[in-house]
């Protein structure tokens, strides 16, 4: 029983580490996108936003992906592009 608990705790620690890495990757990408948008002319920003919106609209997600997850992704992308980090 102790071995099982120890094994579960180890797996939990590994998952937590993976989660931290993913969060760091997302933060880094947010910073990069924000910096890029801030250095673009307004018309270039708008063109990029329209291109990304068009690409998202054309993408047909896999049937195994819940609609809520797809909508969450679309909303987050819109938020990031239209209201970048301060």
Swiss-Prot record:
Subcellular location: Cytoplasm
Superkingdom of the source species: Bacteria
Keyword Plastid on entry: no
Protein keywords: Coiled coil, Cytoplasm, Stress response
Coiled-coil ranges per UniProt: 1-36
GO terms (BP aspect): cellular response to starvation
GO cellular component labels: cytoplasm
Name of the protein in question: Anti-adapter protein IraP
